[in-house]
Swiss-Prot record:
Bias type Acidic residues, positions: 41-68, 93-114
Chain intervals for the UniProt region annotation (Disordered): 1-114
Major localization class: nucleus
Self-association state and partner proteins as the record states: Forms a heterotrimer with H2A.Z-H2B, stabilizing the association of the histone dimer. Also, with a lower affinity, forms a heterotrimer with H2A-H2B.
Comp. bias intervals (Polar residues): 1-22
Residue ranges with Basic and acidic residues bias: 24-40
Protein name: Histone H2A.Z-specific chaperone chz-1
Family: Belongs to the CHZ1 family.
Recorded GO CC terms: nucleus
Length: 114
């Protein structure tokens, strides 16, 4: 019940912690956890997953309506289709050359110094 400095601590009277001497934690050290977990028991919530399965399934999963054939896309679309990339590149607009703009760029700091 007495601490290392000789004073009596009455706040922990009658508990298991009152009978053990205090360890000096020091700077940056956390107090040890008092909860003990059995080795065979995992800390995960795996058991909670089994409980969720017994509940009602979501309404979205039960949507077993017939598929509308007008929404189904038939045909190979782009599969097994030869694509001429050279022709596709000609159809695209030409890209602007940005290298010229880079030469003209002067950061704000350098503009003020001049």
């Amino acid at each position: 019940m007495s601490t290392e400095n000789g004073t009596t601590d009455t706040t922990l009277a009658g508990t298991a912690e009152a009978n053990t001497p205090f360890e000096s934690k020091g700077k940056g050290k956390a107090a040890a956890e008092s909860e003990d977990h059995p080795m065979g028991e995992a800390e995960d919530d795996e058991d909670d997953e089994d409980e969720d399965e017994t509940e009602e399934p979501e309404a979205e999963e039960d949507n077993l309506e017939e598929i509308d054939p007008s929404n189904v896309i038939s045909g190979p679309r782009t599969r097994q289709k030869e694509i001429d990339y050279a022709k596709a590149a000609q159809d695209l607009p030409a890209e602007e050359d940005d290298e010229e703009d880079d030469e003209e760029f002067v950061p704000e700091d350098e503009e003020m110094e001049e």
